């Protein structure tokens, strides 16, 4: 079958509410597996915070509103992040070959920023199972996919949000219904970027805890765990491999697709990702004024300190020209387990920035980076179009891309 036909078939078959989906054509099953996050109390919205590891307490210091007369913006902002149930109780899909045995080899797939549906990733997961023989687990980032309130994807509500953004910020660019929710939330509280990232980080550790304890219904307790990541999912995956919490990822491989650069080497302003106001807010907070902001935000400063090495690795991945020795020495140690596939016409994650970030300032980090240019119209968000016009070329290059990725994860 063609990529297009596979995509349409999987889109029709996939139901995130169905516990078990049989794909007879591929001799695979999709298992939508329930998960309860125990890490939501790190998010904005709590009155008091406590770091159990270091027995340190903090008070909430964020104001969750826009401070302007914009009812729909405020509806998005005044909600307590830590109380959003969809982000605590959710399911994640597992692609698994026909077998009753628990999987001993698993690839965790991490998606891009502002994703609301698994549709794009279904053919990717299917091909990785086919080419590697491994199980593929698609894990959603906090407030993405099925971890967000339905209203954030409601066209009528988002249209009102979008109009308010343009009213108060007439110079905004790349504003759209697709990115109105995430742009609003990150513009007014850029710290959400790190807190939701940390929740996802700890959720994945919780998942690994479950696997290692032997209580996961579909994955063997001694399973090899690798990562395939796309876009900003690569930012998180890379940090996880760098930090190697609990020694869980000492043997894990990571292959990144359209991902890999440091934060200040990416350009996420897009109608599908972030609008210009949110992009500027993120850059201003994490790149230009981070040290000043950390003096104001004691809890964030605690998690960015040497006491939490996840925070230190996150900090090291923000700016290409800072923490160079710390970051690149660690990358050199894990280089043989990391690889990347970059696209030359990618304007969000430019291929040259993937190479510069992963090869280091001295160009001596031996991370494998392959840069290609598809012979059909594509971009970062849609690398494999489903139109009939270029169907044969898309089939060819999708297969080549997935075979390269699978080869790095075998």
What are these regions (language model features)?
Residues 277-410:
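Serine-hydrolase catalytic core
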Residues 196, 231-234:
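Active-site loop->helix "elbow" adjoining a glycine-rich segment at hydrolase catalytic centers
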Residues 21-102:
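N-terminal cap/lid segment of alpha/beta-hydrolase-fold proteins
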